[in-house]
Amino acid sequence: ITMTKIELCETGSTISNCLNPINITTGNGATADIASVEAGVTAATVADFGKATLGKTYTYIQTTMSRAMTITGTAGDCKTEAGTNGSLGAAAGGAADGHTGTAGSAILYVPHFTQDTANYSMMEGSNADGSSLASLATVRTTDTHFRSRQILTSPYTPVAGSSPTVFLAFDTSVAVKELDDDDCTDAGLQAAPPTVTITIQGQ
């Protein structure tokens, strides 16, 4: 996955609104192979929590990520086919063809969809820098990235002289979604954003 912007959200934020976001991105972000990294090993350095404002309390993190994800995976009986990629704006949410053979590396896309606040109030489509935002819970065919919010396991208040350790646990078990069925009879493979648990220690 490619993360291009990381922001912390102050107390009062919700899953659908990042209050007074502060940009803590390191450089231009980073690409991380999260599925192959062993526990406790650094996948990429994407944020500097030292950029947070002292004395402020933060309860959510907001991440801007590319819709394109390079994945080798399976959904039901349908597997990613090497070199058979999805797209930003094609029909069926930009889904890719799969096959029942050996899973290979393919580029899948987080799908485009019209407003769905029941399931996706934590995200909206955007550009790489988190600008040109789509409406809440909407990803447009032209959006190259999406912005997503996640609650911290506990509030974070930066203190002078403190260097917190930030743990991000990624669950990629549902990284591939089959749009219509699991027996691979149609074009239906899409990327599903990984579930992330964020813990900050050493405050």
Language-model regions: role of each:
Residues 1-203:
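A short, solvent-exposed, low-complexity linear motif enriched for acidic/polar residues
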